[in-house]
């Protein structure tokens, strides 16, 4: 039965999300994305106390910080992100058109924004097989991962197909990992 209240594109997006468990979409609110990028760039410059060019600072961040200093940087940045009254608004604006389409408009956003930074050859920051539900989060939440740079080759995140995810979940739940 056709739903008279949603467009065909919304229906396709919802069906893809239900089938695959995720969607990858192009950002529509570039202004909010740029605001977030500029926030990070300003923080990096202040934290490192260097007058760096904005042009490639995010793409070359791995050349600016040592792996041993990354966690302190990340924790300080998370603190600043969550102190800023405009950050959550801009973060939500980036994702809201798609969230509204896949889960509806009755949304709740977590109080704190989190952050993962992974540098080349940094084994300490890797997110192995990751699912928020394994750490006690609701299986009914939608998580937004927002890359701040163009992602390609090894500069990207791999998402398991649903069938493989189910196999790995069973493995983690088995006694082999307890």
Predicted regions and their residues:
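A generic structural signal for short, non-catalytic loop/turn and secondary-structure boundary residues
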Residues: 17-18, 103, 108-110, 122, ...
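Structured loops at beta-to-helix junctions and adjacent beta-edge loops in soluble globular domains
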Residues: 27-28, 113, 118-120, 132, ...
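A structural signal for short, well-ordered beta-strand segments and their strand-loop junctions
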Residues: 24-27, 107-112, 143-147, 156-159
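Generic preference for hydrophobic/aromatic residues in regular secondary structure cores
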Residues: 3-4, 40, 104-109, 113-117, ...
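N-terminal auxiliary "cap/dimerization" subdomain that precedes the catalytic jelly-roll/cupin core
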Residues: 1-102, 106
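Catalytic core of non-heme Fe(II) oxygenases with the double-stranded beta-helix
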Residues: 125-178
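Broad hydrophobic/π-residue packing in well-ordered secondary structure
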Residues: 11-16, 22, 111, 127-129, ...
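Hydrophobic alpha-helical segments and helix pairs
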Residues: 88-131
């Amino acid at each position: 039965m056709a739903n008279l209240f949603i467009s065909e594109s919304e229906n396709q997006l919802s069906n893809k999300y239900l089938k695959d468990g995720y969607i990858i979409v192009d950002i529509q609110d570039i202004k909010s994305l740029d605001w977030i990028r500029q926030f990070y760039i300003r923080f990096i410059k202040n934290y490192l106390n260097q007058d760096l060019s904005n042009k490639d600072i995010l793409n070359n961040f791995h050349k600016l910080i040592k792996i041993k200093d990354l966690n302190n940087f990340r924790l300080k940045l998370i603190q600043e992100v969550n102190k800023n009254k405009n950050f959550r608004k801009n973060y939500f604006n980036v994702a809201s058109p798609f969230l509204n389409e896949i889960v509806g408009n009755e949304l709740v956003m977590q109080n704190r924004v989190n952050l993962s930074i992974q540098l080349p050859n940094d084994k300490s920051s890797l997110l192995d097989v990751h699912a928020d539900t394994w750490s006690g989060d609701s299986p009914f939440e939608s998580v937004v991962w927002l890359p701040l740079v163009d992602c390609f080759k090894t500069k990207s995140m791999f998402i398991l197909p649903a069938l493989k995810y189910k196999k790995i979940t069973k493995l983690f739940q088995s006694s082999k990992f307890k």
